[in-house]
Amino acid sequence: MFAELAPYLSNPRQTLAQILNFALVLSTAFMGWKALSVYTNSSSPIVVVLSGSMEPAFQRGDLLFLWNNSPRAEVGEIVVYNVQGKDIPIVHRVIKAFGTGDGGKKSQRRLEKEADKRSGPGLSSPISHQMLTKGDNNIADDTELYAQGQDYLDRKLDIVGSVRGYIPAVGYVTIMLAENPWMKTVLLGIMGVMVMLQRE
């Protein structure tokens, strides 16, 4: 292997060109991801299902495509949300939704009470639309999964996006990389060597 690398190591200019080529590939992928994020208005426009809580609708390893430009999430809609303080996306279905003017005065009081908890004294309320979620394969709703003191999800603060499409099983690669960190290093190493060995 070192014998194959020797010609490139002896030619710094060509080696630098190959390194820049590899950096270009990575930066192009990054810019593509950012562009997709802006278009979908989602910080994570593509996510992978990590558990079986949404079976049979989605299986572990399915790749989901999200859209986050709708002001509301209706009952029955499948959304992806992040729990405050955690960075693990959860894919579950909306089973209750509360919005301004919906559900009567009782629901509105619940919204205002939750807004006070979330925004704190002296801050304007960011609450616009709230919902309760549940996994199709779960017995109970997601109240126990939410942050301490949180009864509902807020559309603007917690929701990453609504599911608009999916590809089965493709995300298993991501799960394998997450569960085996050493595989990331090996994969990046292989990609780097392949780029370095490309002849112009």
From Swiss-Prot:
Disulfide bonds: none annotated. Residues 1-15 are cytoplasmic. It comes from the Eukaryota. Residues 101-131 are annotated as: Disordered. GO terms for biological process: protein targeting to ER; signal peptide processing. CDD domains: S26_SPase_I (cd06530). The keyword Glycoprotein applies. Residues 186-197 are annotated as: C-terminal short (CTS) helix. This is Signal peptidase complex catalytic subunit SEC11. It comes from Arthroderma gypseum (strain ATCC MYA-4604 / CBS 118893).
